[in-house]
Amino acid sequence: MADREMAAFGAGAPFLRKSEKERLEAQTRPFDLKKDVFVPDDKEEFVKAKIVSREGGKVTAETENGKTVTVKEDQVMQQNPPKFDKIEDMAMLTFLHEPAVLYNLKERYASWMIYTYSGLFCVTVNPYKWLPVYNAQVVAAYRGKKRSEAPPHIFSISDNAYQYMLTDRENQSILITGESGAGKTVNTKRVIQYFAVIAAIGDRSKKDQTPGKGTLEDQIIQANPALEAFGNAKTVRNDNSSRFGKFIRIHFGATGKLASADIETYLLEKSRVIFQLKAERDYHIFYQILSNKKPELLDMLLITNNPYDYAFFSQGETTVASIDDSEEHMATDSAFDVLGFTPEEKNSIYKLTGAIMHFGNMKFKQKQREEQAEPDGTEEADKSAYLMGLNSADLLKGLCHPRVKVGNEYVTKGQNVQQVAYAIGALAKSVYEKMFNWMVTRINATLETKQPRQYFIGVLDIAGFEIFDFNSFEQLCINFTNEKLQQFFNHHMFVLEQEEYKKEGIEWTFIDFGMDLQACIDLIEKPMGIMSILEEECMFPKATDMTFKAKLYDNHLGKSNNFQKPRNIKGKQEAHFSLIHYAGTVDYNILGWLQKNKDPLNETVVGLYQKSSLKLLSNLFANYAGADAPVDKGKGKAKKGSSFQTVSALHRENLNKLMTNLRSTHPHFVRCIIPNETKSPGVMDNPLVMHQLRCNGVLEGIRICRKGFPNRILYGDFRQRYRILNPAAIPEGQFIDSRKGAEKLLGSLDIDHNQYKFGHTKVFFKAGLLGLLEEMRDERLSRIITRIQAQSRGVLSRMEFKKLLERRDSLLIIQWNIRAFMGVKNWPWMKLYFKIKPLLKSAETEKEMANMKEEFGRVKDALEKSEARRKELEEKMVSLLQEKNDLQLQVQAEQDNLADAEERCDQLIKNKIQLEAKVKEMTERLEDEEEMNAELTAKKRKLEDECSELKRDIDDLELTLAKVEKEKHATENKVKNLTEEMAGLDEIIVKLTKEKKALQEAHQQALDDLQAEEDKVNTLTKAKVKLEQQVDDLEGSLDQDKKVRMDLERAKRKLEGDLKLTQESIMDLENDKQQLDERLKKKDFELNALNARIEDEQALGSQLQKKLKELQARIEELEEELEAERTARAKVEKLRSDLSRELEEISERLEEAGGATSVQIEMNKKREAEFQKMRRDLEEATLQHEATAAALRKKHADSVAELGEQIDNLQRVKQKLEKEKSEFKLELDDVTSNMEQIIKAKANLEKMCRTLEDQMNEHRSKAEETQRSVNDLTRQRAKLQTENGELSRQLDEKEALISQLTRGKLTYTQQLEDLKRQLEEEVKAKNALAHALQSARHDCDLLREQYEEETEAKAELQRVLSKANSEVAQWRTKYETDAIQRTEELEEAKKKLAQRLQDAEEAVEAVNAKCSSLEKTKHRLQNEIEDLMVDVERSNAAAAALDKKQRNFDKILVEWKQKYEESQSELESSQKEARSLSTELFKLKNAYEESLEHLETFKRENKNLQEEISDLTEQLGSTGKSIHELEKIRKQLEAEKLELQSALEEAEASLEHEEGKILRAQLEFNQIKAEIERKLAEKDEEMEQAKRNHLRVVDSLQTSLDAETRSRNEALRVKKKMEGDLNEMEIQLSHANRMAAEAQKQVKSLQSLLKDTQIQLDDAVRANDDLKENIAIVERRNNLLQAELEELRAVVEQTERSRKLAEQELIETSERVQLLHSQNTSLINQKKKMDADLSQLQTEVEEAVQECRNAEEKAKKAITDAAMMAEELKKEQDTSAHLERMKNNMEQTIKDLQHRLDEAEQIALKGGKKQLQKLEARVRELENELEAEQKRNAESVKGMRKSERRIKELTYQTEEDRKNLLRLQDLVDKLQLKVKAYKRQAEEAEEQANTNLSKFRKVQHELDEAEERADIAESQVNKLRAKSRDIGAKGLNEE
């Protein structure tokens, strides 16, 4: 990446990559590969040095510091060449060893480049200063960049993970490890920041956020401050050290947008809560609270702002310079707000934190003479108990005297001070840990959104390997975790290496380096390993650390190589055993391991926590079960509670979960390194860094790299860089493939040829070989440079010598000139010349000056003009520049808009494809959903049956209540009789009072009477006491009666509530069903099918609505019954008060009477016993009803869970199908690419054919030139023979051409047959797949039948169970009716009933077991069905692929048909040529006949000549020789004549043979043409049939849509009737629905318009195809014309005929052109019409969008109204709570008054009756007030329920409206897509029309040129004719 490219990174560029200048300087640095080395050093680990000498296996070297050292040769390690200085990926180092890695990191760190790659790792060094490499500019620069395209950075790792997730559709993980202070937390924050920026959900998240909460991105980012406050602390190395590990999963949607997040935590250092080292401090939250930023918090927690007041937090430092605790506290508090914590939750967290502070200050002392602790002051205990919601005395008692279970009894145990202190520390740690885990769970709940999520990226921030002087249990857990992670890395790394080798085709034996660490892992985690032995020892009560050590030694010492006995060194902590880890040997001290692993708590205090009034604390310990947790009845073994699980077991469980998560992801590794322990920026401590490199696996990774081929270079780069080693191997100017060149080059070098391998694209090197090649290259370069220097020096010296020679020559010339001048200077003429010469020059200079002045004036004027012109131009230029900039901005904006539009278009096309695929999937899933629908209806029927059973139970209860009321009336009658008897007694009491008064008057008269009266008073007091007891008993019996009544009412309310719950669940199921129906309707609407099923669903919906009405009516009836019950209860209460009042009056009378009847007491006791029996029976009945209701609820929950699992399974199937779809897409792309290659190859062959035809035409033209020599026939008769030979050769060529054409035809037919055969095979394969699919479906049906049988069996079992329950109910009713009459039989029946109940419970358990087995079989069958469905999907996909192949073969057939037509046209042209040849033959025949006539004339002339010769022979005997020669000529001519005759006969025979061939070809052509026409007709019929079918489907869909709208309107009307209370809101919603219906109508109209436009487009496309065919015909005819024109040059007559034909064809083409023009104009008109339609569609779409927005606004208003109603509901709840509080106060006052009443009764003994009556009146008033308050409370509860129901209905309605709006939006988007597609098609049609016009113009132009050439040829032929005539005439004259 060049410097200009690095400019994108802004100010961070210098901190990320070296500049080009630095790289050049580094490469030119002097370097000697043999001498420059690393040597070991005690302080610095390794130092750079130069070798001085080598002797006897030892090396002497001089270090950089000038120090001379001698070391062994195997300790010396070579340095890397300067090319590798500050390399970004250390795996590319040619010498890959520890010092090379160390110095590369050190040099990069010195340049502040803190990120470096090491193979798969990214190593980061903590800079201890701020660097500008995390800003928004850097984030933008890394976005979308590959790893190789950008410098190393945590953003690059994050972006690669994000891109891999989107492209590979696989979960990713980023593993960030390192020591404390290395920067893990900061890098984790940066990763989260990067994802929050690039994958933000944007506006949607802002709309969705609730008031007070942030967006999802804010919440993810703000989770860190909250967790850091409670999980981070200051350590020696780091001011903000994370004392826990975390795995943050960030979930994304299918498009890569943020969906949700969750956090898992590991190994929180809870010991820090109570203990810190001197240089460290506790968790930040304690000091943040003490910072006094929120004073009200200090008051609430009862603490001061001085940390030293609290023992737990003042053991180390209390302030940190780099942290502002007050600001951090505000950040923590605001983070809680953003994360949605309620004020109650925040206060609970702060209270528990404050309680831990006070825990540390609790003091205890030893009791005298006892080993027993007691509190030393209770102030701190009171504070902590108050904050925790506990009783202080109970807390102290639990700490000092805990209860311990011994056998089956609990015993109080004494604790000493040390044990109490340990218990306090353990409780504080446990509270803090559980609170931290609760916070993580609460944050996860906030980050869990309801948005769909597809993939996640996990970020693991966990402590690295630890080797300290004192290593304990915590270090073992951390090191074990890192051992597992390192094994995971090793395995993953070499799996990737192997994949690379496999991809490159390199032979490689796989070595699983993950197994190297298996021995150590097994030693720790396997059975009888360290962890299992530790857990085993924890179970034994007498086990100690030493017994644990002994067991370890017995099992592992000497048996495992990784387990060793340590060597203890003085001054260091004692170690008990050593483990050999991958990072080194670690000595472990086992003191306190058993205690740490068990981590016991004071269970008495934990029990107090569980009962705490602080809700958070009780929730934290709600699931805690100690060591004595009870055994589960259903299982054989005891199972401890989750809270008592050992630390090691819990850690292993969490670690296994983490490893499972990581294995399911694609990992990325980041290793953080701390450079020094002083936190100094830029300083690197070499031993510390080397220790970390060993610990974090970087050197382990390098070790693995060295086993393979760590260095690899692309062939092109290798050839370019190392060609210099042997240029002869790759010659210049000769093209050689890069791989072959690299093979030749490496083969020619003197190196070990086993050290490299050749891949497909790269050459791979073992470690060190590349350095050797670099050394050879440097040597070669030095030799070349030396040679260049020598040559350049020679050239320079030669140039210098040449200059010296030139100087010498010039000196000689100057000397000669001076000598000549000295010889002539004294001549008189010369002197005269010297005088005149200056004068001449002065005159000339004056003229020149004058001219120059004039010129200066002109130039000055011109300059002024040019200046003015320049200014004008500059002004113009400025304005033009401004315009240019404006235009550029406009162009840029247009380009951006265009790019955005293209992106949107591409995205929409992709979405369309995905939606089409989803539509296909949904059609296949439709049947499954219908089956699920049927199952739901069956379950609904079952629930209805259960509801009816519950109603029957309620009726039974009501009957029992009626019986109880009757009995009560009977008792009331008895009470009335008693009152009548009491009235008689009252009269007696009146008489007695009179006598008493008389006695009192005579009191003074007689002391004896007084004594008697005193005795009477004593007896009366005794009677009063007895009567009071009786009254108390009666009141107790009344209270019990009241309680029974209350219990019955409570049971009734509970049953009514359960009934409501079941009804609500039914309503929810019905709502879910309606949603499923709507989805089905939507899918039917999209798929254009299944109209009948939709009507069924609508009928079912109407039935459900009827049922809903019935249920609502039933609810109203129940509410009325409840009201009646309440009124009856009020009457009973009133009656009770009257009775109590009457009883009190009776008691007063009895008191005075002093008598009591034992009979009444016995009757009261009997009644009381009967009431108690009835109460017990009713309680049993209510318990059983509650059990049945709970069972029903459980069944309902199970059914809901099953539905959820089925939905999850369907989603998984969907994901699998999408994956297979993408794979098939890839296969299809491969096939299409192969087809394109075949088409290209075919085009190349056609080009070759054309070139051959051109060559043939050239040969023809040459042949024609040879034919011109025919004109010399008149002069030489011998040329006839050559002309005949030329003609025969042409005939042979034509024969060859015809045979070639026939061969091509045969090959084409053969290929056509092959294609047909392939098509038949594909059809057979498709049929086979269809058969397999049918068989799979058959198997699926069988499995479904089996499943149905199982469900029927389950239903039968449930029926048996219900029967048993009914029998139980019958026995119970029987027992209740006969209870009063037969007590003995009742007891026996009770025993039998108990036995029957036990049997029934056993039967229920058996049934449940069978149900669970049936559920398992059901799940198994479901899985098999899913597998079968997957097979079906695959077979469907294969069938679809076969269909695609068939379509491709159809296309190929069409292409072959076109080729056949072309061959047919060529055949026609060959026929024409044959005809022309026949005409030429005819001409030749004529010429031959003429030649015969000439021959006869020649014979005659010959005879005449012979006669003359004979005459001459007689005269001249000497002329014999000439006669003999003439005779020879004659013989030759005769032979030539014979040859010509034979040639002519052969030509005639060949012509006849060719004519026969042509006839046969014509017949075959006619047959094939007829067959093709027949097939085309069949195809047209099929197309028409399909079109008709589609139209029928569209009509059916239209009808279904109308039915749907009608049913929707009907449903809306029903809703209007049901929602009478919300008329205004319903009006708005119905208006929105009407708008939606109008939008649907508009959509229909748009669809019809789109169909019309589609038809028009199809017509246009067809017209366009016709145009193309016409143009192809014109082009072919043009070729024919050219061929005929070339033939015209040879034969003039043929030229004239062809010209006539051309004129005819020209007329035809002109007519066709006119047709084309007309078609083009019609196309343009259609385009205009389509544009108008498109604009209309766009306006309509915009209107629909506007209507959607209006509907959205109305929905928002509805939501605000719902929120207002929710507020009203909250107010109602507050008022009800207030009334409840008032009720409690009233009850308290009643109790007080009762107490006062008792006191008043005692006072009444002394004569205070009036006061008692007043108090009773007051009590009655208070009871009336209480009844009124209870009525009001009941009314408010009723109103609250109504409002809750109304809110639910409103939310449901708003949800429905939102779904409608979403559907409308989808429709609008689809319409816009179609509109764009039609636009694009129209534009393409216009472009094609324009191209056709241009082609037509081109053809017309070529035709004109052809005509011109024909005219020229005709003129040339005429000239040749004239010439031939002249030559013939001349020849005749000469003869």
From Swiss-Prot:
Residue list for modification Phosphotyrosine: Y1308
All residue ranges annotated as the Myosin N-terminal SH3-like domain in the record: 32-81
Pfam entry (one): Myosin_N
Residue span of region Disordered: 1915-1935
SUPFAM superfamilies for this protein: Myosin rod fragments, P-loop containing nucleoside triphosphate hydrolases, Tropomyosin
GO BP, sorted A to Z: adult heart development; ATP metabolic process; cardiac muscle contraction; cardiac muscle hypertrophy in response to stress; cellular response to 3,3',5-triiodo-L-thyronine; cellular response to angiotensin; cellular response to hydrogen peroxide; muscle contraction
Family listed: Belongs to the TRAFAC class myosin-kinesin ATPase superfamily. Myosin family.
Descriptive protein name: Myosin-7
Species per Swiss-Prot/TrEMBL record: Rattus norvegicus (Rat)
